[in-house]
Amino acid sequence: MTVEREREASGRVPGAVWRGTALQVLGRFWGAACTLAILWLASGALDGAGFGRFTFYIALFAWLDSVANMGTGQVAVQRTAAAPARMASVLAAARGIRVRAGLFGVLLCASFVLARDEADGAWIVLASLYPVTHALELSTIPARNALSWSVPVAVRAIAAAISLGNVLALWLAGVDRPALYLLGVALGSTVGNVLLHLASRHHLPRERGEAASESGFFREALPLGISALCAQTYFYVDNLFVEAWCGLEPLGHYNVAVRVMSWSIMLAQYTTLTVLPWLRREQLAGALGPALARLGPSLFAGAGLACGLALPWTGSLLALFGEEFRAAANSLRWLLGATTAIYAGSLFMTALVALGRNVASLWIAALGVLLNIGLNIWAVPALGIDGAALTTCATEVFVALAGAAVILRAGVSLGSPWRWLGGPLGLAAGAGLSSLLAMGY
């Protein structure tokens, strides 16, 4: 057993996990800066309704990403993290699913655009083709299994810059059509997937794999795919409620707050993405519990403290996009509460994948959707965009608690329960300290 393997077996977090996470967070900082710049440019170029429409379709495309991915990346890691000889056949199976699912997403988008009789609908449908190229992104699986993220992060940074460059060119040209801004963003993502494949080719098996040899791949991927769709649904379905009850302009304000939240959860997203191969190997070695107990509480507490410190300043942050965006300040406060919950929930849901509890992940996400829709039916008409944010917070708390319950029922210990109180306590302490600073103490 190697030294690194001994560390993994003892539940310690390998250095490669932290290096990979740090690289991804740095890349995400750049990507977030590009996204915020895109939103700032679009908010200036488009009228209130146009900007709301732009952010609506950005949210829809995020949902289409999950349609195209359909859980294939996670199952590919499940099957190859400890068995790299299966790489060729696994990639063949996963790519076939992604292409078909991506094209199905295009049909869904086209039907939606036709039903709404959208202006420039053809450009929107053209932009919706980019998720099909996620089949190329699977070429990074060998690097993910090796916890090596330098090339994928660099390529994603280039793709974000291309999207920003496209939007900047449209802004400089005085374009005021939301669909063309969507197309500019989608083009950057497409180029990024192509570059990821080209940069990762030398790590791929030379032989062609046979998808048929990976029996049951789609059956294993489907629960995870639907689970991811449910997660995207309860994250973005509030757009439909806000548009219907509040209008497109408040929707634009709300979606900027959601984008800030998306930026705030990046460490959770990329930590869980990085640790999945390691957690899978830990589970096979019978050491998943110590690994989770070592990684989770400190991450959760740090997230709570950071979100608490930001709570009094949400209005000032949103005002960077214009004074009118202060209307979403209270919404962002609720969303920061949701962020804290996500730092625990995302790790628990990743642990379920490591355990092979794919169906349990699906049930949790499906119940999250039902809870979210039920609360939105009441909260948005009663509280406006603040109600949508409150609903998101409640849903993420439910997902975190449900994930922890399933892990415990599987016989995996999460360590001392007191250590997991750091998230809410950090949120309260950070909010109190930051409020005192805001008052001049």
Predicted features along the sequence, with ranges:
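Membrane-interface junctions at transmembrane-helix termini in multi-pass inner-membrane proteins
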Residues: R79, V132-V155, L336-A365
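Transmembrane alpha-helical segments of multi-pass transport proteins
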Residues: A33, A173, G368-L371, T395, ...
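Helix-loop junctions and terminal segments of transmembrane helices
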Residues: T35, L39, A68-A85, M261-G296, ...
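Interhelical loop/hinge segments that connect adjacent transmembrane helices in multipass membrane
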Residues: T2-V17, S150, A154-V155, G174, ...
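Signature of the first transmembrane helix
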Residues: V3, V13-G73, V106-C109, S163-L164, ...
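Alpha-helical transmembrane segments of polytopic membrane transporters and translocases
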Residues: W40-L41, F51-N69, G184, D238-L240, ...
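Hydrophobic alpha-helical transmembrane segments
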Residues: I124-S128, V153-H203, L367-N372, I385-I407
